[in-house]
Design a protein with these regions (language model features):
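Intrinsic-disorder/low-complexity, polar/charged segments enriched in Ser/Thr/Lys/Arg/Asp/Glu/Gln
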Residues: 120-122, 167
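Intrinsically disordered, low-complexity Pro/Gly/Ser/Thr-rich segments with frequent PxxP/GP/PP motifs
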Residues: 148-182
Length: 305
């Protein structure tokens, strides 16, 4: 099994560990009711929740307020020129909590992550929460264990999902380790260490493609369900090959009395077993694992709840 660097989700000094990654199978009693059931022009419906898409990138773009004051803040981060798909209001909030910069938001194949559906690995992020959400994605280049620290690193993607049904498709090249988190309803802060204080998704593409949900930064973070589909073309009306969510193939703090964790021995991987799930132990004795089934190309559907 290939070594894979998970972005440890707490203090900087705890983010130096490498681990071997693994995968999960959905519980037979788990019913995921988010299948796309209708197609009409640029609008899909997920159980009657519309997913608005543009014809160019199959992603929703929100312009937001356009005033000069909305594009400025007291932060060093500039909102004067907005990346594709990021609203001025969302950029302004990101600046107010101390983020280093807005995302690059490439709309072409840049060899890493970009907005669009033409890559070997695609991620569809769906707002199912009913409140404005800002998607934040990062690339862990050269095993950079600080890549998720948004106070010192520029993310690859920051994208506005302003209402229920808002969706965007992101492509990733093979061989890409990275992750995502989300800002909910203009209320999610950065942690004291500079990470988004919410639930994380972590992934690596390529030969040992794996994805997991991590709750280590904030055990009380917002809920997310991640469904893994096999090689493209993908039919999301079929059952996924694997599911990771808040209770399945998820990293959680071992102690129920803490709100966050990250030290060796302080967390565990729960409910990650089955033919499409893998669990392991790294050299420090920490659990490793997550959802596989999308080697060198596949589709990941992420629903924010």
């Amino acid at each position: 099994m290939m070594a894979f660097t998970r972005v440890r989700t707490m203090m900087l000094l705890l983010l130096s560990n490498s681990s071997t990654v693994c995968h999960a199978i959905p519980s037979p009693n788990l019913k995921i009711q988010t299948y796309i059931t209708h197609h009409s022009g640029n609008t899909d419906e997920v159980l009657n929740v519309p997913l608005y898409r543009t014809t160019v990138t199959n992603a929703m773009m929100t312009s937001g307020p356009n005033s000069q004051s909305a594009r400025e803040s007291n932060s060093n981060m500039s909102c004067f020129s907005l990346g594709y798909g990021l609203s001025a209001r969302d950029c302004e909030y990101m600046a107010s909590i101390g983020m280093f910069d807005q995302g690059r938001n490439a709309i072409y194949n840049n060899g890493k992550m970009w907005i669009g559906r033409d890559g070997p690995n695609t991620f569809t992020f769906i707002n199912g929460a009913g409140v404005p959400i800002i998607l934040v994605m990062w690339y862990a280049f050269n095993k950079d264990n600080t890549s998720s620290f948004m106070n010192i690193r520029r993310p690859e993607i920051t994208y506005s999902l302003p209402e229920t049904g808002s969706a965007v498709e992101i492509s990733a090249a093979n061989g890409m380790p990275g992750g995502w988190s989300m800002i909910y309803n203009y209320s999610t802060p950065l942690s004291e260490y500079g990470q988004i204080r919410n639930t994380f998704g972590e992934f690596s593409t390529g030969d040992y493609a794996t994805v997991d949900v991590s709750r280590l930064v904030n055990m009380a973070g917002n809920s997310v369900t991640v469904r893994v589909f096999g090689h493209q073309p993908v039919d999301t009306t079929l059952q996924p090959v694997c599911i990771t969510d808040m209770r399945t193939c998820a990293y959680v703090c071992t102690s129920r009395s803490v709100g966050s964790c990250g030290a060796t021995g302080s967390y565990q991987l729960v409910n990650c077993g089955g033919p499409n799930a893998v669990e392991g132990i790294d050299e420090h004795g920490n659990p490793t694992g997550g959802c596989q089934g999308w080697t060198n190309g596949g589709h990941i559907e992420v629903i924010f709840l």
